[in-house]
Amino acid sequence: MDRYCVFGNPIGHSKSPLIHRLFAEQTGEALVYDAQLAPLDDFPGFARRFFEQGKGANVTVPFKEEAYRLVDELSERATRAGAVNTLIRLADGRLRGDNTDGAGLLRDLTANAGVELRGKRVLLLGAGGAVRGVLEPFLGECPAELLIANRTARKAVDLAERFADLGAVHGCGFAEVEGPFDLIVNGTSASLAGDVPPLAQSVIEPGRTVCYDMMYAKEPTAFNRWAAERGAARTLDGLGMLVEQAAEAFFLWRGVRPASAPVLETLRRQLATV
């Protein structure tokens, strides 16, 4: 039976095995998928050994940049992102790297939540790998403006310059952000520590601005609580992004696109009972 996995460290918390088991049951695809705790000091060797038999893998923290350097060929979106979250073993044994994070977030926003980006003013918080992965698909939706804000302004400016050929994208520090915005996406890990990036209240227009945190938890994240208190029209978390990026990876491996809605519903129910 074809074998797949997710590489990470730590990895015990991963929902990917459940997601892909549900996808396989739904589509009738015969495969096994498990979580692999990869060593911090030898990810390349560990991954190569898996791919002596394995057909594909997802990659989570902290190995996305190492996976980018490991592969024999890259998709255009992975090249742009500078990170790989999906590995595919080709027929000749070479490894191809792709990045489905941006496609997953975009599909969660547009298909699941009905959020339009075209002609809108969009603020992305953070300039790390999570944000790098979504810039290309976001700019493909032709927003009026896409602003990247980061604690270190230079990093945001440099990142914006890398993607300037794709649309109206700029970078700045948190203190320089002037609102309001139609959509704000938190790509920082601040919510994990219960923090929120230091933003002016003007970034949110009550009743209009949609706020999305790439993090998720049983209770609303710190960022989404902050947004709701300031009148955001809607607050969304990253659980849908997790499911949608997995669906995109499943499609790359198997050529079958699973229905994500029932899987997302299952995960929501499970999260509520934790």
From Swiss-Prot:
Top enzyme class: oxidoreductase
Enzyme Commission identifier(s): 1.1.1.25
An example Gene Ontology biological process: amino acid biosynthetic process
Pathway the protein acts in: Metabolic intermediate biosynthesis; chorismate biosynthesis; chorismate from D-erythrose 4-phosphate and phosphoenolpyruvate: step 4/7
Binding site for shikimate: 14-16, 60, 85, 101, 216
Function of the protein: Involved in the biosynthesis of the chorismate, which leads to the biosynthesis of aromatic amino acids. Catalyzes the reversible NADPH linked reduction of 3-dehydroshikimate (DHSA) to yield shikimate (SA).
Family: Belongs to the shikimate dehydrogenase family.
Protein name, per record: Shikimate dehydrogenase (NADP(+))
